[in-house]
A protein has these predicted regions:
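Short basic (Lys/Arg) and small-residue
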Residues: 372
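Residue-level preference for beta-strand/loop junctions
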Residues: 31, 114, 147, 186, ...
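C-terminal outer-membrane beta-barrel translocator/porin domains of Gram-negative envelope proteins
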Residues: 106, 230-361, 369, 377, ...
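Bacterial N-terminal signal peptides
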Residues: 8-17
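Gram-negative/organellar outer-membrane beta-barrel architecture
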Residues: 91-243, 316-320, 330-331, 404-436
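Bacterial N-terminal signal peptides that target proteins for export
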Residues: 1-9
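Extended low-complexity acidic/polar segments
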Residues: 189-200, 272-300, 377-422, 431-435
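Periplasmic polypeptide-binding modules associated with outer-membrane biogenesis and secretion
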Residues: 21-111, 121, 135-154, 159, ...
């Protein structure tokens, strides 16, 4: 008990110290009329990347509240380890310390079917100084070393030619045996996601993707199967930041059509076609609220798929990216899903800048505890037989590039024993693309 009290006291001390440091970095009296704005420390970042995030304007009184929000938004770009402001009279100067933009490093991620994947990656977090992130990767499963392989190229940015059109491009080659769905996944994927900010808190979403599955035995064609995906949606986003959200709500609705191109005609008195063809209705809702160093988050991801869905596209529940009450296996597979989560975070150590041998980065520590709800079914209405629940706890390390490293332990009364997990990136993000 004494250790727990000391731990809480230490965390509160860090929190107070962080607030005190923030106040001192302002060094600008509230209400001072801003006559000009300057930037310092932008070695690789173009000024317009910063300017579009600023709320304090020349000719207006300086607001510390606006700066606090500016700082969160600028940190959300994942380009800077430190952001501070100073003013000499009305001359407002923003100072930045940039994150090391070239990252040659081991590549890793966790998936439900391949477990921990390791490999090599080369990433540039700020291509041309325009907040464009590009990354090439090779990964192999630690469980099936050099047998389950993945080759990937990713590129993304929140803007396109100065327009508020966020985009994310993905090229993925997979050579891997899927022991959850029991088939050899030799596939190619090209995917483009768009996010156009129509209003300050309203975005129009679009997606288009092409997949080619080699040796796709579930399509009645052992050579290959080609599938197109295209979808439209909208999102209301009132979060303070997209990364490490502390406050706000997010709601997204997306309608996507998936259709196999090389469908096969089958006749037996009556002709019909065979092939995957379904619609996906997605709802993604998130809400966060802070009280001191505590952050409460509640999320719900629901995907309903009317139509013909083949086994290689079934959802799987079990693992660090979906449901932490069990390990992934072929038992909990289904066409439709609902993932529910309630999580409490304790910010033990808020984001801290650091530098080693000229490489700038940041780190933070959060303690987490929560509840996972898993609902998965194939047809009709789901019942209690389709539901499982679990509690979990762990430690999150907040770091650049991958958002966070997650060390978690889950327990489900249905299983009766703890499950240990390691993951990267927020679960609300990885649960959207956990298949790969």
């Amino acid at each position: 008990m004494k250790k727990l009290v000391k731990l809480v006291g230490l965390a509160l001390l860090f929190s107070v110290a962080g607030s005190f440091a923030t106040e001192n970095t302002l060094a600008c009296p509230e209400g001072t009329v801003v006559s000009s704005i300057q930037f310092e420390g932008l070695e690789h970042t173009k000024p317009r990347v910063v300017e579009r995030e600023l709320l304090n304007k020349a000719g207006e009184p300086f607001s510390a509240e606006k700066f606090d929000l500016e700082k969160r938004r600028l940190q959300d770009l994942d380009l800077f380890t430190e952001v501070s402001v100073d003013c000499n009279g009305g001359n407002l100067k923003y100072s930045f310390v940039e994150i090391f933009r070239w990252i040659p490093a081991p590549a890793g991620k966790t998936t439900e079917r391949d477990g921990l994947m390791i490999g090599l990656a080369l990433a540039n977090l700020n291509v041309l100084g325009e907040d464009i992130r590009a990354e090439v990767q090779y990964r192999t499963s630690s469980e099936r070393f050099l047998d389950n392989n993945e080759y990937a190229f990713y590129a993304s940015s929140p803007y396109l030619f100065g327009l508020p059109l966020g985009w994310n491009f993905e090229f993925l080659r997979t050579d891997s045996y899927d022991d959850i769905r029991d088939y050899q996944d030799d596939s190619w994927l090209i995917d483009l996601d768009l996010d156009y900010q129509l209003l300050p808190h309203l975005s129009i979403l679009g997606t288009v993707a092409y997949r080619e599955l080699e040796k796709a035995v579930f399509t009645f064609d052992e050579d290959s199967a080609e599938l197109w995906e295209y979808g439209l949606g909208f999102a209301f986003d009132f979060r303070d930041t997209k990364i490490d959200t502390r406050k706000g709500v997010y709601y997204e609705y997306m309608l996507t059509h998936v259709k196999q191109l090389d469908r096969i005609a089958i006749c037996g008195g009556r002709c019909y076609t065979e092939g995957e063809d379904y619609w996906e209705l997605l709802t993604d809702a998130r809400a966060y609220y802070p009280v001191g160093p505590f952050v409460t988050g509640a999320t719900a991801l629901v995907r309903y798929r009317p139509g013909e869905v083949y086994r290689f596209d079934y959802f799987s529940h079990g693992g660090v990216n979906s449901y932490r009450g069990r390990y992934a296996d072929g038992e909990r597979l289904g066409v439709h899903e609902a993932l529910l989560n309630l999580e409490e975070r304790f910010v033990l150590l808020d984001r801290q800048p650091a530098s080693i041998a000229g490489v700038n980065f940041f780190y933070g520590v959060q303690l987490v505890a929560g509840f996972d709800g898993s609902l998965i079914w194939n047809s009709g209405r789901p019942g209690w037989d389709n539901y499982e629940g679990a509690v979990y706890g762990g430690v999150h390390l907040v770091v650049p590039a991958v958002d966070r490293l997650r060390f978690e332990v889950g327990y489900s009364p249905d299983r009766g024993e703890p499950k240990f997990f390691f993951g990267m990136i927020e679960k609300v993000s990885t649960s959207r693309w956990r298949g790969r």
